[in-house]
């Protein structure tokens, strides 16, 4: 496959995709994958080891929300000392600790200390955004001649799934590990008409951390009606460490065949 390479310094750019589901004989399925490669020294930490000497997945409470919902964190670990924490609220990446080129471990994502802070800040910090990442202008769209009006939460526009998007939902979780990777899988059902979107949408997001120091995020969804969807991961990264200051000297290379231009409304 040929790719167009886009290289830029991090400022205000965003790469988006726009997907429409159409039902034929069966439920339509969309899948895509985001892979993050953490490049650094191959350092095996004494505290982790390899094989059966350490637990690849740890689960613990992360406190409760103001409405009483209990939140849990799943820590995925590998043999290189990398650890990523995912919580069932919003399928959020809470932290990503990895070894840099100098052998130092840093948390390279931004996050909060309490789960309620993620809802109060409304910054979509580390969350899976859905049903639709970015704005839909005036909260309106049409499919097959049918007009739909969404819940508006950004002036007249619908932003990141609406008033109660996927980032504010509790996801069902399951875990799996083998001798080279650890996975937490999260599932969510969005009912027909939720936030104004047509179709019942069943979404799965899985995070897999491998001993090759890759964090792989797989997305899949099925719908029973023509709809729009644009799932994304809204983590804020600073490869120097979350408390290291500006990221404006970072450079990003995106291998993409195409991109969707965006403006302040969509």
Task: Describe every region a protein language model picked out.
Residues 8-10:
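Cationic, low-complexity basic patches in intrinsically disordered or flexible, solvent-exposed regions
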Residues 13-18, 22-35:
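Bacterial N-terminal signal peptides that target proteins for export
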Residues 49-82, 88-266:
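An exposed, glycine/acidic-rich loop-and-rim segment of catalytic or binding clefts
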């Amino acid at each position: 496959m040929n790719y167009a390479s886009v290289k830029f310094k991090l400022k205000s750019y965003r790469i988006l995709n726009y997907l429409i589901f159409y039902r034929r004989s069966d439920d339509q399925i969309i899948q895509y994958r985001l892979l993050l490669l953490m490049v650094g020294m191959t350092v095996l930490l004494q505290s982790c080891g390899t094989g059966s000497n350490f637990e690849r997945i740890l689960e613990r409470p992360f406190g409760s929300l103001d409405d009483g919902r209990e939140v849990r964190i799943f820590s995925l670990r590998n043999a290189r000392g990398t650890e990523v924490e995912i919580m069932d609220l919003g399928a959020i990446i809470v932290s990503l600790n990895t070894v840099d080129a100098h052998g130092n471990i840093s948390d390279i994502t931004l996050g909060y200390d309490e789960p309620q802070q993620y809802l109060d800040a409304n910054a979509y910090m580390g969350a899976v955004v859905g049903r639709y990442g970015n704005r839909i202008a005036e909260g309106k769209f049409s499919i097959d001649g049918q007009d739909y009006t969404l819940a508006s939460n950004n002036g007249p526009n619908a932003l990141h799934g609406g008033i109660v998007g996927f980032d504010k939902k509790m996801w069902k979780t399951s875990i799996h590990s083998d001798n080279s990777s650890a996975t937490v899988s999260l599932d969510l059902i969005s009912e027909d008409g939720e936030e104004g979107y047509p179709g019942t949408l069943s979404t799965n997001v899985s995070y897999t951390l491998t001993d090759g120091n890759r964090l792989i995020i797989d997305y899949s969804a099925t719908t029973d009606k023509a709809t729009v969807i644009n799932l994304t991961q809204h983590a804020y990264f600073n490869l120097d460490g979350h408390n290291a200051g500006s990221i404006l000297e970072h450079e990003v290379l995106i291998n993409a065949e195409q991109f969707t231009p965006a403006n302040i409304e969509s």
